[in-house]
Amino acid sequence: MLLVMDMGNSHIHIGVFDGDIIVSQIRYATSSVDSTSDQMGVFLRQALRENSVDLGKIDGYGISSVVPHLNYSLGSAVIKYFNIKPFFISMDTTDLDMSAVEAHQVGADRIASCISAIADHPNKDLLIIDLGTATTFDLVTKDKKYLSGSIMPGVKLSLNALCQGASQLSSVTIVKPEVAIGYDTKTNIRSGLYYGHLGALRRSVEEFGSPVYTIATGGFAGLFKEEDIFNEISPDLILRGIRIAFLENNKKGV
């Protein structure tokens, strides 16, 4: 079995693949993971056992990380506690044409999502929108040319900034508001968060020009599922992209 990990700024998303099927998924807050390799190794083994994953069957480990200061400890933990050399996805491990951008600045999660989207929809121009800590937009042409896109604060990050910057405002649960015009502070905030982000999503898609097939992923993609912005929502896009990159590089002996 192949274990893949998407290490984001807010959450760690772990997937266990048996062939091309995800048989287990685990989510933890990134802040819950200690930074030493031993602590991380113990944490990972315990998390997998708690989710009934047979550690003896894991024979590969693929990682997408946008938390560089944890990469060394994570890699060391996998080697020591799983006896596996981990594969880290990067600009050097993909056949995406990234010549149009500063490739070294592109996050591993964005690369993984593009790889997965291309595999699912070959010969299409694609727009991948990842609604996580940040909301990112990535354009990829049908001939696998990565054009990048844009980045804006995510829904939760916007809420946190609002509450930290305005002393009389407190946090709210993030849900689609029942009405656009709020009747108290909480419903005002919910309305602003939802419709403000929705407006930014619509305008960004519009500004990217010619018709593209639009795929959403990330923790807040489902918040906008009733809107007509996306052609599809793919929660496992990054995990599947890590798997594809792992297998392709394994064939090359990387």
Curated annotation (Swiss-Prot):
A monovalent cation. Ammonium or potassium. The keyword Metal-binding applies. Keywords: ATP-binding, Coenzyme A biosynthesis, Cytoplasm, Kinase, Metal-binding, Nucleotide-binding, Potassium, Transferase. The active site is at D109 (proton acceptor). It catalyses: (R)-pantothenate + ATP = (R)-4'-phosphopantothenate + ADP + H(+). Its cofactor is NH4(+); K(+). One of its GO terms (biological process) is coenzyme A biosynthetic process. GO terms for molecular function: ATP binding; metal ion binding; pantothenate kinase activity. Its main location: cytoplasm. Pathway: Cofactor biosynthesis; coenzyme A biosynthesis; CoA from (R)-pantothenate: step 1/5. InterPro entries: ATPase_NBD, Type_III_PanK. Catalyzes the phosphorylation of pantothenate (Pan), the first step in CoA biosynthesis. HAMAP family: Pantothen_kinase_3. PANTHER family: TYPE III PANTOTHENATE KINASE. Belongs to the type III pantothenate kinase family. This is Type III pantothenate kinase 2. The gene is coaX2.
